[in-house]
Amino acid sequence: MGSPHMNAVRWLYPFIHGLGLGVIAMLLHECGHLLAAVILGVRVKNVGMRWNKGLYTVRQQGSPLQNLLIAAAGPFTNILLTLAAPWSPLFGLANFCYAIANALPIEGSDGYRIAKCWQQLRSLQAGKKQA
């Protein structure tokens, strides 16, 4: 049967394990944004962490296309990690959930930034067609 303390530890281990995998998913997500910014030549000013935002990247504004690609790079990284993680279904699930949550077009999310950049790109294209 075991002592009550051992039962608590058995319950706590999967929670801590899942939380740790979630933090790793978040770190890799932000690395995806950072790598995309560097590849696209957008200067990164600061990378930090806040209790209400998790990790964040402060960078110069790029073109609407650069901003769209940088915003999409985070969820894309998590999707790639989901597909590349058959050795750990829990790690795959953490990455999948993180990708979906960030891809939703809710203000402040990557999905919201992607939608705004997409609108800017369409406006620019419409302006070029009229000219």
Feature map (PLM): residue ranges:
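Hydrophobic transmembrane alpha-helices and their immediate loop junctions
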Residues: 1-131
